[in-house]
Swiss-Prot record:
Translocase as UniProt keyword: no
Membrane spanning residue stretches: none
Assembly and binders: Homodimer. Polymerizes to form a dynamic ring structure in a strictly GTP-dependent manner. Interacts directly with several other division proteins.
Keyword Nucleotide-binding assigned: yes
SMART domains: Tubulin (SM00864), Tubulin_C (SM00865)
Protein's GO biological process: division septum assembly; FtsZ-dependent cytokinesis; protein polymerization
Protein name as annotated: Cell division protein FtsZ
Source organism of the structure: Buchnera aphidicola subsp. Schizaphis graminum (strain Sg)
Places the protein is found: Cytoplasm
């Protein structure tokens, strides 16, 4: 049996959109009225910030960019965030949990998001990042810049969810409009934030507090997220199976997850046996050593509908450990790596192996890059 725990809804949760894509995703969440969280948009582009309808906006790097954006250069994004580090620290201070949303491959999102994450971690905040990777047609240069951004970000977050934009093409109809496609993408990010936040902020039959969430997500590395919705007689089993078998999650082995966080959202008609069904379905793929936390959120508007949100953390921990060994590098070494990756990748088609060899010859060092896991949450409308 799964035992209920006491509710604690005093946790301060902030959602920070970094760059154009992150700002658009956060604006979508504001419109959807996710409860119990504060929203921020951070950008180098003053015009973009004026257009976004978010609770609080923070312009960074004005002395560097003059409010004109990072120009798809992550170095400008990084230095802009460093310039206004105290301003960012003030915005994040007092948080218990911070979600960072960004698009990798552009300027502000790629360069500034790791700085924001580093500040949050220095403040002792539980830090979760949800980022996108570019479509293949955007070119190898942008993809490699995105990979480097993910690598930098992974050093400063507790859990990292990456979303490959190309997987979006497999779950949407070919005739869908561009606007609807990006709306669907933002819904995935919303689902990740909402599913976790509502466990803490919204009352349910089986409540979960912030300490439970922290246990599952702190220092866990790569993570995945899936959502399933169903109605009718077998809604519990169907929703749980959809959540763990989304096409967005293909080729991902969930059995190695060290932590699993589950939120069941339903109306007042939620039955105990449905709670058990979801729990048993989730445990069928989780390892015996995984920490599994299952809670519920009651939504009176969900008549006959049940939603299951699953966040599996600690996936591919060996790869994540290899990545975090780079923490021992000096900041100068990391900066030189980052600049080389961005400035020396030709915009034409280049074999990634050749680029890695060039980097190796420059440093006289071998570098290991993790095989990034394709895991869900939101899709970028803009990456810088």
């Amino acid at each position: 049996m799964f035992e209920p725990v006491e509710l604690s809804n005093n946790a301060v949760i902030k959602v920070v959109g970094v760059g154009g894509g992150g700002g658009n995703a956060v604006e979508h969440m504001v419109r959807e009225r996710i409860e119990g969280v504060e929203f921020f948009a951070i950008n180098t582009d003053a015009q973009a910030l004026r257009k976004v309808e978010v609770g609080q906006t923070i312009q960074i790097g004005n002395n560097i960019t003059k409010g004109l954006g990072a120009g798809a250069n992550p170095e400008i994004g990084r230095t802009s965030a460093e310039e206004d580090k105290e301003l960012l620290k003030s915005a994040l201070d007092g948080s218990d949990m911070v979600f960072i949303a960004a698009g990798m491959g552009g300027g502000t999102g790629t360069g500034a998001a790791p700085v924001v994450a580093e500040i949050a971690k220095e403040l002792g905040i539980l830090t979760v990042a949800v980022v996108t990777k570019p479509f293949n047609f955007e070119g190898k240069k942008r993809m490699m810049v995105a990979d480097q951004g993910v690598l930098e970000l992974s050093k400063h977050v507790d859990s990292l969810i990456t979303i490959p934009n190309d997987k979006l093409l497999k779950v949407l109809s070919r005739g869908i409009s561009l606007l609807d496609a990006f709306g669907a993408a933002n819904n995935v990010l919303k689902g990740a934030v909402q599913g976790i936040a509502e466990l803490i902020t919204r009352p349910g039959l089986m409540n979960v507090d912030f300490a439970d969430v922290r246990t599952v997500m702190v220092e866990m590395g790569y993570a995945m997220m899936g959502t399933g919705i169903s109605s009718g007689e077998n809604r519990a089993e169907e929703a749980a199976e959809i959540a763990i078998s989304s096409p967005l999650l293909e080729d991902i082995d969930l059995s190695g997850a060290r932590g699993v966080l589950v939120n069941i959202t339903a109306g007042f008609d939620l039955k105990l046996d449905e709670f058990e069904t979801v729990g048993n379905t989730i445990r069928s793929f989780a390892s015996d050593n995984a920490t599994v936390v299952i809670g519920t959120s009651l939504d009176p508007d969900m008549n006959d509908t049940l939603r299951v949100t699953v966040v599996a953390t600690g996936i591919g921990m060996e790869k994540y450990s290899d990545v975090n060994q780079t923490k021992n590098k000096s900041s100068k070494e990391i900066l030189m790596d980052y600049r080389y990756q961005y400035l020396n990748i030709s915009p034409t088609a280049i074999d990634k192996k050749n680029v890695k060899n060039e980097i190796k010859e420059t440093d006289n060092k071998k570098r290991k890059e993790p095989e990034y896991l394709d895991i869900p949450a939101f899709l970028r409308k803009r990456s810088d």
